[in-house]
Amino acid sequence: MEMKEQLAYPKERIRYAVLSFFLAQGLCFSSWASRIPDVKAMFDVYDVFYWGLVLFLIPVGKFVAIPLAGFLVSRLGSRIMVQASVFGYALSLFLIGAVSSIYALGACLFFFGVFWNMCDISLNTQGIVIELSLIHI
């Protein structure tokens, strides 16, 4: 978000907008975390090693997203990236519950990790810009 764009809105409104995105991100993750046993049972995965490999795709996606998120935030701005990444994060969460194959689940978990980290990076970038504007003005 550019500094000029921020000043067009009241400071409290800006703070609450960013806070609401952090809240939405936390709700998405807690929704997934509470459903892990159900998803495991849905796919009849009883091998702990195999299930661990499937779940490991989340941090792999997060790792892959680090350079991608930095590039996109610098190109498009944190405001657009927050909106796009929250949408992708919620969509991947929906798809986790809708897939019928363990391989599709793995792909959804990978993209869940990608959008989760893109959301983290763009939200924190947005938060830094807002914090600086609130302190210096």
What residues fall within each predicted segment?
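Pair of pore-lining "gating" transmembrane helices in MFS-fold secondary transporters
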Residues: 11-35, 110
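Short amphipathic helix-loop junctions that connect adjacent transmembrane helices
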Residues: 34-48
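Central cavity-lining transmembrane alpha-helices of secondary-active solute carriers
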Residues: 53-70
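Conserved MFS/SLC helix-loop-helix module at the cytosolic interface between two early adjacent transmembrane helices
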Residues: 67-89, 93-96
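Helix-breaking motifs and short loop linkers at transmembrane-helix boundaries and internal kinks
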Residues: 98-103
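Hydrophobic core of transmembrane alpha-helices in multi-pass small-molecule transporters
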Residues: 104-119
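Intracellular juxtamembrane helix-capping segments at the cytosolic ends
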Residues: 118-131
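Conserved small/polar residues in nucleotide/adenosyl-binding loops
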Residues: 135-137
